[in-house]
Structure formats: C-alpha cells, structure tokens
Amino acid sequence: DSGMEKGLEKQTPVHFGSGDSASTNNLIVVDENNTYQTVDGFGASITEASAHLYQTNLNDSAKAAAMQALFDKESGIGLSMLRQTIGASDHCVAPYNFAPDEQDDSLPNWDFSHELIEIMPTVQDALAVEPGRITVMASCWSPPGWMKENGSVLGMYQNQKGTLRADKYQAYANYITKFIQEYASRGIDIYAVTPNNEPDHASYDWPALPMSHTEAQNLVANYLRPTFDRN
C-alpha cells in the first residue's frame, strides 16, 4: 500500500507547543543563529503522462479543482515550482523528442509541436493559478537517440550504454537551449536547468543519459554555458 490515493487528502492538523525535555521523540530544536541552505520551493512535474490524463479525463471544473488543490496557497498545498522534462521521461505516453532525425548541430528540423498538444496547455493552467509565484526548471532525461552512442533514447539498448557521443555535445547544448527559448517565447522563463536526470542510472526501460561527473563538467563548462551566453 503506497498511500498514493491519499496524496491530496487533508490530514489532522499538527499542533506545535513548547518543548518537553522528558519527551524527545517529537522534539524539534531550531537554532535561529545558524542559517543553512535556502529552500527555493517545493513542487512537481507536469509530465506527458500527467498532462494526458489531465487533458483527456477531466472536465473543466475538475481541471480547475485539481490546479487549485496543487498550486493555490490557501485552498491547496501551494506548490511553487515545476520541474519540466525536456522531451520524454519515464512518465510519458510514448518516447518522443524534438529533433527525431539526425541533422546538423544547429537542429534546423527542430519540431516542438508535441509539447504544445497537452503539456504546454497544462503548464499554462498551473501558472495561471497564481501568476508570477510559480517558478519553472527544466531537466532532460535523454537527448534524441542519434546524439547517443547506443542510438536510442533509452539508457541501455542492446547491452550498450546510451552515453552522449563525443561529437554531439554542441548539438545537445543547442537542444536544451532551444527548449528554453520555446518556453520563453510563450512567456515562461526557465529558472534553472539540469543537463540530465539520474546520471548514474542507465535504464533499459526508459529514457536516460548516463554521464560521469567529468562528462557533465565538460558539457556545462565548454558547451552549455557558452551556448546560453550566446543566446
């Protein structure tokens, strides 16, 4: 029993009071003199799978109720961040990407239409709940298969890891940049980017990009950051 069916069910309020040294099991000690890492927010991801269910299974009133429950600070849980996938993830209807055919590194045959069918409208509904409060980050599970050593979006295919081809680092940087530009052209600024998801996990079952820390350093320092700066 995962308890997932109770994910949005309101629970009994927890009442805080003065600490009791005799009972340490529920004692929280707050040291106001020490500040550590700042939490920017808490959120979720609108994957293709969730967007598909939202767009096809809910009527307008149910859609509004779902968005209020997720993103409204007063009537819902007040999520304040979205982590959007750049292309397919392990929660998609079927694997897809925005440059399916091998092409020049500038990606002249870029096609963003798949994102616009169900994902983008769902993201826009979420952002409309409290305009300006929700920030969006982007993460890529895998670039198109032709950019990878195994020719597949999967992390492992035919017993070969799907690492990034040495000659496709710039193509991949352009791929991520174009995604950010597509969102920006629709009034959605991407707050942060991670170049891949779970880099140590090469899955046979879903899109993944195995990447060592040195490969990630090379990608970010020599390709991704300079491409961002140029655009």
Give the label of every model feature segment.
Residues G3-M4:
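Acidic, contiguous N-terminal accessory segments
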Residues L8-I190, M211-T214, N222:
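N-terminal catalytic cores of secreted or lumenal carbohydrate-active enzymes
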Residues S139-C140, A192-E198, N231:
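Core alpha/beta catalytic barrel or barrel-like domain that forms the active/cofactor pocket
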Residues M147-N150, D200-D205:
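Active-site clefts of carbohydrate-active enzymes
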Residues A202-N231:
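Gly/Pro-rich turn-and-neighbor structural signature
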